[in-house]
Every structure is written in structure tokens, then in C-alpha cells.
Amino acid sequence: MTNNGNEPNLTLSDLYDKDVVYTSRPSYISNPWLKPDEHQSNFLTGRELLIANQLPVIVHEASATDKLHQLFQVIGKEVPNSIYTFNNQQSYENLIKQLAHKENKKIYFQYIHDETILNQQYYALDKTLFVALNNKARIPEWTNGKFLPKRKVVKIEQFENEIKNWEFPLVIKPGDDLPTAGGYGVMICYHDADLQKAITRIKEATAETNSLIIEQKIEEKANYCVQFAYSESLGIQYLGAATQLTDKYGFYNGNENTTNVPEHVIEAGRQIMENGVNQGFFGVAGFDLLVDEDDNVYAIDLNFRQNGSTSMLLLANELNSGYQKFYSYHSKGDNTHFFNTILKYVKEGSLYPLSYYDGDWYGEDKVKSRFGCIWHGDSKETVLENERAFLAELEHY
């Protein structure tokens, strides 16, 4: 069962200097491959509060209301004191500038921001390096040319000619520095109708994208997010791995805990992490590694940044070790019913809260609330039964 007294194995403040402030919010400035709406981006700011420890985090005011305090209280936790809050684009960008220019802070960005918002000299992790490590076209550099499916990087104007030489199923990804997340920006094509949809998206992004990656679609038997952390004092630490839950088109449906990760998969991840560290990386990274029927490992995405399931791995001591599932939910419209249903399951001990974006901060039911959490229980069957009951209750209001 839940052990409320346990502390995380490792916290984010173990990895960063005292002058670092963390923001997980994507920039307000749009990007054709990453288009979460404003509320989703604000919701992301509360995701790491339980693993931050002393690391100051920039959080939207709606992600730190009394609702979150109530949920944390049930599990014996408190909202950290070391948070900086904002409430709109102007206050967010002003806060970042003030922290850097007036308070001599370095900002650790989950997603890079434009130079007009903050000059790269104020980044905790070198911006050029961060961009390079997360550029999908440069994956072969960080894997030493190993763990790669058949792939080709092409100029966007050559794409429609080149794609004629490929067979389905295939994957198309942006080959530039713009970030993607949760499968958005990754286009899996099983047939010509999928390809035509992808071509439409590519045309919309032509102004900001120079190149694309075409990749053989791996028929995987397992899809792991293998995670590591590094600081100079700690060295490289293996945090664990989570199984990625995605639909057939690669869209993210959460993570579940996994045991008995094959050693050669962990070792592949460690080699990639070592390459990043040798370039100057520090912090948390998670690598999407597929295993096919022949036990070959393929690196399909390298996230040299925190991942959605990082909290699940770092909070393992707090959770039932049987089965865990990380996911998030949106209110159906009645935010009070949404919150009360969540509170019920948190009190029952089957639902572990991570973040709560309070839509009522904007006015009653003006915006749909959102909730990030970990389900945990003795078995997968028990957890999924609880989740089904929870979803059914959310529908009845």
C-alpha cells in the first residue's frame, strides 16, 4: 500500500544548482509541430511539484489552488513553498526575465523559448546543446550510429519524390529543432490516406521546417521509456523504465510501470546517456526504445528532458509496487463533480495525485479542470477496474 512517510529516491533539486529555476511550460509562441492549447500548457507547469523538493518551479496560478492543497493533504504532502506563479503570457515572460536579469537565476527550460523572451546566456543548460540533443535528425550522433531503424533525412521540397521509394508502414518526423511531445508531430502512415494527411500537415509547417525524417515503422513487441539522471556529484543514475501506452498512430495514452526490463535495453539507454553527458548534458532524460521480435533495440526518440512518467519512477517508494499507470484526465464540464470524484479515489488510496489545473480559477465551469495522477494497486486488473469505475462516475453528473 501507499507509504506516505517515504521520500522520493532522488529529487530534482539533487540535480541542479541552487540558482536554477525550472519551467516545464512550452513557450506561448506557437510551433507547427507542438500545438497544445494554452490550458494544457499551463497544466504542465504543475507536473513536477512532488519531485521538485527544493528546486523552485514556475507554476500557473490555476495549478496551485486550494484544490491541489486538498489532494496533497490526503497523501500527507504539501505544495512546495519554492514556487513562482504567473497567470498569463505577459506575467510568465516578465517573471522569467525578472528571475534572470534581477535575481541572477538560471532557467532550466523543458522546452526552449525564443531569444526575444530570454537570451541563451541565462539558460541553466546550454541552449545550443539542448536543441542539438533533442533534434530527431541528429539521433545517430547520440547513439553512435547504433539502434537505428532504416531512416533518411530529406529536404522538405524533396519529400514527395523521396516518399515514393518507401513502403508502408512508415513514420515521418520533423527533422529540425522544433520540439514535439506526446506523439504530436510524429506521423505514422499505414496507407495512402494517412500519407495524404501527413502531406497536408507538412505543407502547413513548410515556413518553419526545412527537413523531414522518413523512417521504417518498427513492429515492436515492447515500447520502453528508459530514464536516467545525471549530475556531477551523483554521476549517471538509472531511474527505471516505463512502458509507453500509445495508439497505432503513436499518440500518447500514458505509461505503466514495468519490471524485468531487458539488460541490453538498459545498456543501450546508458550508452546514449553517456554520449549526452559527454557533450555537457545534466538533468533527467528519457529515451523511447523499441524492441522487435528478434530482440533488436531501436531508438525512435531521445528526450533529453523530463518525461511524463518521470514522477512515477521517482515516487516508486510511495506507490503500490504491483501495478502503476501514469495518466491525466479532463473534466467533462462540471468541475465540482470532477474534483469530488478524484478526491474520493485519492482517499480510497488507489489514485495518487500529481497535479490539478483548477478550471474554476477562471470562474465556475468557465474552463475544464485537468488532473495528472498515478493509478496504483495490487494488479493491473484491479487498477483498470478502478479506472473504469472512475470514468463511469465522471460521466454521471
UniProtKB/Swiss-Prot annotation:
Keywords: ATP-binding, Ligase, Magnesium, Metal-binding, Nucleotide-binding. It comes from the Bacteria. Changing Y252F: 2% relative activity. Changing N255A: Loss of activity. Changing L44F: 14% relative activity. Disruption phenotype: Grows in rich growth medium. Residues 131-347 form the ATP-grasp domain. It is an enzyme of class 6 (ligase). Optimum pH is 7.5-8.5. The active site is at R305 (critical for catalysis). ADP binds at K136, V171, K173, G183, V186, I188, E215, Q216, I218, N223, T246, L290, I300. One of its GO terms (biological process) is methionine metabolic process. GO terms for molecular function: acid-amino acid ligase activity; ATP binding; identical protein binding; L-amino-acid alpha-ligase activity; magnesium ion binding; protein homodimerization activity. Pathway: Amino-acid metabolism. Mg(2+) binds at D288, D301. L-amino acid ligase, which preferentially catalyzes the formation of L-aspartyl-L-methionine dipeptide from L-aspartate and L-methionine in the presence of ATP. Less active with L-asparagine and L-methionine as substrates. Less active with L-aspartate and either L-phenylalanine, L-valine, L-leucine or L-isoleucine as substrates. Decreased activity when L-methionine is substituted with seleno-DL-methionine, L-homocysteine, L-methionine sulfoxide, L-methionine sulfoximine and o-acetyl-L-serine. Decreased activity with acetylation of L-methionine amino group. This is L-aspartate--L-methionine ligase.
